[in-house]
Amino acid sequence: MGQKWKLYIVKDGKVIRKNKFCPRCGPGVFMADHGDRWACGKCGYTEWKR
């Protein structure tokens, strides 16, 4: 915990998020990228990649 700074990059003076936010939990809760799916560690919501 406490490493949310790793989920952002600065490009051309703008901040860009690397991961998606969870649609259930809302902004501030990132989803983990597991290669074949996106998963929320807080609520368990999963989106499969095609």
From Swiss-Prot:
Gene3D superfamilies: 6.20.50.180. GO terms for molecular function: structural constituent of ribosome; zinc ion binding. Keywords: Metal-binding, Ribonucleoprotein, Ribosomal protein, Zinc, Zinc-finger. It holds the Pfam family Ribosomal_S27. A zinc finger (C4-type) spans 22-43. Zn(2+) binds at C22, C25, C40, C43. Binds 1 zinc ion per subunit. One of its GO terms (biological process) is translation. InterPro entries: Ribosomal_eS31, Ribosomal_eS31_arc, Ribosomal_zn-bd. One of its GO terms (cellular component) is ribonucleoprotein complex. Its cofactor is Zn(2+). Part of the 30S ribosomal subunit. Belongs to the eukaryotic ribosomal protein eS31 family. This is Small ribosomal subunit protein eS31. It comes from Pyrococcus horikoshii (strain ATCC 700860 / DSM 12428 / JCM 9974 / NBRC 100139 / OT-3). The gene is rps27ae.
